[in-house]
C-alpha cells in the first residue's frame, strides 16, 4: 500500500543513511525472551532484552540486582499518574540515570545511578527502528493498535513516527491516529519514554511533543545551507534522527514548562535553537 511505501522509504533512510538497525514486526513477531524483539506480550513497550544488555554494558560495576531495579523503575506503570508525569520522570532517568540501591558484601547500603544511554559515546548504544509494531493497551478494554514506526534506543521507545500516504494531508496522522494513541484508554503507555512525535507523508514532515496541539507541530526546516532543495521529511530525519543529533536533542533540548495554566507542557526545541 501507499502507506507501506512511505514506511519503507523512511526505514531505508534510517538504515542506509543513518546506520539504524530495523525490524518489520507485523505478523512476523515472535514472543518470549528469544523472540523477535524479546517482548513477552503486545503490551510491552520497552524492549527489556535490549535495555538489560545496555544497562550491563554501561554499568559494569553495578551488581545484577541493582540493574534489575533500574529495569523495574523504567517499566513501571502507575495508574494514578498521567502520561506527562510518567514522561517527565522517565526523561530524568534517561538523562541522568536511574537511582538504584543495593547491599554490598558487608551489608552496607550502596547508592548509584544506573546509566541508560551513553551520551558521550554514541557507538555504545543500540538504535533500532521497528515497523508496524502491534501494541495493546494496558487498561480495559485493552485496545489493539499498530504503530507505523517506533525508534528505540537501548530498548526505550524514544521516537514515534506516524506515516501517511504521500497524497494525504499529514494532519490526518495527528487527528486520526496520534490523538487516539495518546489517550489513557488507548496506548498512552507507549509514550511514557517518548522524546518526540513525528508525522509525515514522505514529503512533508512535522514533529511535536506528547502535549503539543497540532498548531505546535513544526517542520525541521533545514540542517544547513546546502539543504535548500531537499524534501522536508529527509531534512527532519537527518536533523533529528541521526544518532548524535537524537542523543543531543534528548539530553539538552527538551524541557517541561509549568508556567501556563492548563498543566505541564513538554517542549522540544525548534531547529534554529539547536543548530
Label every model-predicted segment.
Residues 1-275:
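ATP-dependent helicase/translocase motor core
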Amino acid at each position: 500500500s501507499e502507506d507501506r511505501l512511505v514506511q519503507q522509504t523512511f526505514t531505508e533512510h534510517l538504515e542506509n543513511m543513518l546506520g539504524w538497525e530495523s525490524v518489520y514486526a507485523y505478523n512476523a513477531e515472535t514472543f518470549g525472551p528469544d523472540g523477535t524483539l524479546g517482548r513477552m506480550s503486545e503490551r510491552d513497550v520497552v524492549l527489556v532484552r535490549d535495555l538489560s544488555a545496555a544497562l550491563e554494558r554501561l554499568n559494569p560495576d553495578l551488581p545484577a540486582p541493582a540493574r534489575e531495579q533500574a529495569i523495574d523503575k523504567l517499566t513501571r506503570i502507575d495508574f494514578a499518574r498521567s502520561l506527562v508525569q510518567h514522561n517527565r520522570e522517565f526523561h530524568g532517568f534517561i538523562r541522568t540515570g536511574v537511582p538504584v540501591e543495593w547491599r554490598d558484601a558487608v551489608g552496607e547500603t550502596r547508592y548509584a545511578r544506573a546509566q541508560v544511554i551513553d551520551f558521550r559515546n554514541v557507538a555504545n548504544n543500540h538504535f533500532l527502528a521497528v515497523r508496524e509494531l502491534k501494541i495493546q493497551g494496558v487498561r480495559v478494554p485493552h485496545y489493539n493498535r499498530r504503530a507505523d514506526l517506533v525508534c528505540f534506543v537501548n530498548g526505550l521507545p524514544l521516537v514515534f513516527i506516524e506515516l501517511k500516504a504521500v497524497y494525504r494531508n499529514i494532519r490526518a496522522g495527528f487527528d486520526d491516529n496520534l490523538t487516539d494513541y495518546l489517550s489513557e484508554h488507548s496506548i498512552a503507555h507507549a509514550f511514557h519514554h517518548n522524546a518526540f512525535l513525528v508525522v509525515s507523508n514522505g514529503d512533508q514532515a512535522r514533529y511535536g511533543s506528547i502535549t503539543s496541539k497540532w498548531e505546535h507541530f513544526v517542520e525541521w526546516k533545514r540542517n544547513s545551507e546546502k539543504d535548500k532543495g531537499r524534501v522536508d521529511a529527509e531534512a527532519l530525519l537527518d536533523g533529528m534522527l541521526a544518532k548524535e543529533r537524537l542523543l543531543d536533542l534528548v539530553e539538552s533540548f527538551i524541557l517541561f514548562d509549568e508556567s501556563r495554566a492548563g498543566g505541564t507542557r513538554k517542549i522540544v526545541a525548534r531547529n534554529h535553537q539547536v543548530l
